[in-house]
């Protein structure tokens, strides 16, 4: 009887460790995304994740429409739900179309006179998979300014992250990265997508 119980416990233990191999994040730690700060944050953010227009307005912009999307993770690689994601960027003309939060900035980088509906800022909330997305446009690029967007992520259990997203070809991805509302995207539209998985310092309550 004792031998039978011993064999049963051995098999049960082996099954536990064999199953755990399918969940590598139990032991992994994700590399925390480094902070890169930007002085051109808007004084007031638009409350939608569509930067191409204000809510209830028609779109009229000059440039290529894109998706910016990805996942927010904690340092244990666990997806972070209900994180607030703030995005801001310049338009195709290289200027920010809003009033800046800070006063000591280069005023030439901003414009309030434009017939474009592009707002330059937006807010999203991550879903239960840690996913977020924004509809935006490719910003201006030159030898001095690279194509990029700025992002800040806030969650009550984690350290706030602010960084820059490099909108270069190496960060392009297919349209299966994240969940996007099909109402906002035409099925036949081949919209360029840029994906960024961002890791915040700290851990959430749940574990994988």
Swiss-Prot record:
Keywords: Dioxygenase, Oxidoreductase. It is an enzyme of class 1 (oxidoreductase). It holds the Pfam family Dioxygenase_C. Its EC number is 1.13.11.-. One of its GO terms (molecular function) is oxidoreductase activity, acting on single donors with incorporation of molecular oxygen, incorporation of two atoms of oxygen. Belongs to the intradiol ring-cleavage dioxygenase family. This is Putative dioxygenase RC0543. It comes from Rickettsia conorii (strain ATCC VR-613 / Malish 7).
């Amino acid at each position: 009887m004792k031998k039978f119980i011993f064999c049963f416990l051995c098999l049960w233990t082996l099954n536990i460790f064999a199953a755990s191999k399918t969940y590598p994040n139990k032991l992994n730690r994700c590399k925390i995304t480094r902070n890169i700060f930007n002085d051109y944050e808007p004084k007031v953010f638009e409350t939608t994740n569509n930067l191409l227009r204000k809510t209830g307005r028609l779109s009229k912009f000059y440039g290529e429409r894109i998706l910016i999307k990805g996942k927010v993770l904690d340092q244990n690689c666990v997806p972070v739900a209900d994180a607030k994601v703030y995005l801001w960027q310049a338009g195709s003309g290289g200027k920010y179309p809003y009033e800046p939060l800070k006063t000591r900035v280069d005023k030439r980088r901003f414009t309030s006179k434009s017939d474009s509906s592009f707002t330059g800022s937006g807010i999203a909330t991550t879903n239960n998979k840690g996913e977020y997305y924004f509809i935006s446009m490719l910003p201006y690029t030159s030898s001095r300014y690279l194509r990029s967007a700025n992002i800040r992520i806030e969650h009550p259990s984690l350290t706030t992250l602010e960084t820059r997203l490099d909108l270069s070809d190496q960060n392009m991805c297919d349209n299966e990265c994240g969940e996007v509302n099909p109402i906002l995207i035409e099925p036949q539209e081949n919209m360029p997508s840029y994906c960024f998985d961002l890791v915040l310092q700290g851990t959430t309550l749940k574990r994988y």
